[in-house]
Regions:
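Small-residue-biased structural context
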Residues: 1-191
């Protein structure tokens, strides 16, 4: 079973391949709008679904397990995801193959390329070094199942998140309210 870090890397490779296909299609004369749609639609959906599931299962665990500035890595990643979502949204609002569409696709690609490079160097590497393989594989199963169930964004709330609020929510979720205020050292009566 592949661990989550390997599945994320596999998605990153797929994203790069799809953007390369768009390069090839852009070079063709005349531009084939239907071919662009066949590449863009699944790419746009997967970019959004990929960010969604990372925010649901990967980044909360990175905040718990990471030690190499996991909070900074997460803040940056959520901001990057917002930039990617904005680019996808802008491209989806424009007519395919127009200058406006290509500009939005270009912004999406740039934001995604920056994010993937940082994530590969920082968050994924940190998680591999500090999270046990069993956890990475369990998260990999969840990730794979979710991606298989959601080939599109249908039914998912694809929204920008405030990075600082996201981190605060995740860190708050890991702290349970204390019910026992003892020192946790046992009885002092010698029993």
């Amino acid at each position: 079973m592949a661990d989550i870090t390997m599945l994320i890397l596999t998605d990153h490779d797929w994203f790069r391949e799809q953007f390369a296909k768009l390069d090839d299609l852009q070079a063709q004369t005349p531009v084939d709008q239907r071919a662009l749609e066949r590449v863009w639609r699944p790419l746009a959906d997967k970019l959004d679904v990929h960010a969604y599931i990372e925010e649901k299962i990967f980044y909360p665990q990175l905040l718990k397990r990471g030690t190499d500035d996991a909070e900074g890595e997460t803040l940056d990643a959520i901001g990057d995801h917002n930039d990617i979502r904005d680019g996808v949204r802008d491209a989806n609002a424009a007519a395919i193959a127009t200058d406006e569409w290509w500009a939005a696709v270009g912004r999406t690609r740039l934001a995604n390329d920056d994010h993937m490079g940082e994530e590969e160097r920082e968050g994924l590497a940190d998680f591999r070094r500090h999270a046990p393989i069993g956890l990475r594989e369990a998260l990999g199963r969840q990730y794979r199942e979710f991606m298989a169930q959601h080939p599109t964004t249908k039914g998912l709330s694809i929204v920008d998140r405030d990075p600082e609020s996201y981190v605060e929510e995740q860190e708050g979720a890991t702290r349970s309210p204390r019910k026992d205020f003892s020192l946790g050292i046992g009885s002092l009566k010698g029993e």
